[in-house]
From Swiss-Prot:
One of its GO terms (molecular function) is FAD binding. Its EC number is 1.1.1.-. It holds the Pfam family FAD_binding_4. InterPro entries: BBE (IPR012951), FAD-bd_PCMH (IPR016166), FAD-bd_PCMH-like_sf (IPR036318), FAD-bd_PCMH_sub1 (IPR016167), FAD-bd_PCMH_sub2 (IPR016169), Oxid_FAD_bind_N (IPR006094). The modification Pros-8alpha-FAD histidine is found at H119. Disulfide bonds join C40-C104. It comes from the Eukaryota. It is found in: Secreted, Cell wall. This is Berberine bridge enzyme-like 25.
Amino acid sequence: MGNSKPLPTISCISVFALYFSFYTITLTSSTSLQDDFIKCLYRNTNVRFTLDKTFFTPERNASIFTEVLESTAQNQRYLTKTMPKPGFIFKPVHESHVQASVICSKKLEIHFRVRSGGHDYEGVSYVSQIEKPFVLIDLSKLRQINVDIKDTSAWVEAGATVGELYYRIAEKSKFHGFPAGVYPSLGIGGHITGGAYGSLMRKYGLAADNVLDAKIVDANGKLLDRASMGEDLFWAIRGGSGGSFGIILSWKIKLVPVPETLTVFTVTKTFEQDRSFKILSKWQEIADNLVDELFLRVFFTVSGNKANKTVTMAYIGQFLGEKGTLMEVMKKDFPELGLTQKDCIEMSWIDSIIYNSGFPTNPPPPIEILLQAKSPIGKVYFKGKSDFAKKPIPVLGLEGMFKKLLEEDAALVIWTPYGGKMDKIPESEIPFPHRNGTNFMIQYYRSWSDSEKRPNRRTKWIRELYGYMTPYVSSNPRQAYVNYRDLDLGQNKDNSKSNFIEAKIWGANYFKDNFNRLVRIKSKVDPDNFFRHEQSIPTLPV
């Protein structure tokens, strides 16, 4: 696969006949570029495609173009009128179309972005703020999934969602699962490039820890698999973040065993019920040391009106087993929570996906909702940040955190426990380095609606909360999760040679010492920095 054969050229007559049947050229500089790109695509692929279903421009039909652009973009903050828009959008329907896209973009010197599910926190998969003009390669039509229960594996294309993958696994077996994220609308292509954690992480590690093979298009338009790309590049794409080394076409993943019966629960406590922080402090002490089968997160939200606002803590758990065994574990290790049999709900693994996703639970939607690529929280404007705690946060620190939370109405903080399998995998196994010694990960999240008159006030607040937490989290470097991308940490400037110096700071936040190896691999496989964005891995300075 490493040495792709030259693709046959379609005759000029057939190219232009097909082209003009779907597209009318307007003599402007932008459409001239579109014209050149389309003709180049046809010359470099032998798999036909129709322009009206794959190629979208504001000149042809502005409303359809906008609909396609916004279709999977999850952060509305990057769809405002002032944000740059792609000159056109191309939706490949075959892997050779992706190869041709790379070849033609390189030949015509077109900067592009690649989107699978549109969940990038800072929108870099569909917006370029540093290089304009740009175009968008949207992989949403590449979503085939082939599950092989006998081989305990599956091939899944980059445009498929996590929800679709889970559904197709459950369709074949009730005893198999996969340890990826909890939100069903996540695009599998980009999700795994950042590591990808979920409710099975303490038992089986990350999604990226369970990748067996991959197909990728490199900077020369070649189609590579694990054998032809080599182990260095295969290492880099499993957690080194997307948009740096090539375009992921598909992953071969390892399925993991799950029991026929899982148990889930939610126990909610208000600040008034845990004013001394006895329960929360105990969670900090034991959450990463519980049995590997138990995954117990804490969600902090603000409830009540102005006169009666309080912080609510929802302890949301999943146990790989029946509720009787879970009750024994909780009575032994975390009696302070007060879990009861009534709190526990037994269900299948696929039903637990619906439960953990945040969809309504009374009644829950049918599992077919996983095929609809719907986000349970909808599409909102938001800003997110992340941290890693290496030790329990003292009561004084918790008091200050709660005080900051009460300043807002739509604030969300999530604590995710580590330990288990995460402790057993070395930091350098893949680029994702947050392993042994991590008690829990923290996500800070603030959303708002399009009617918000002062969005800058919301982003200012989350930055203040992040600043307040500084003494209580990791340092030197202050670690961050790359799938919760945060441009506050720093960003590249155009295609500048100075990017490496500045990137060492945010690179250490995301990857610790693994950043240096990522840069060496990037410099080898993409020396011209063809694949780039605001936080892509830079090349070594010449």
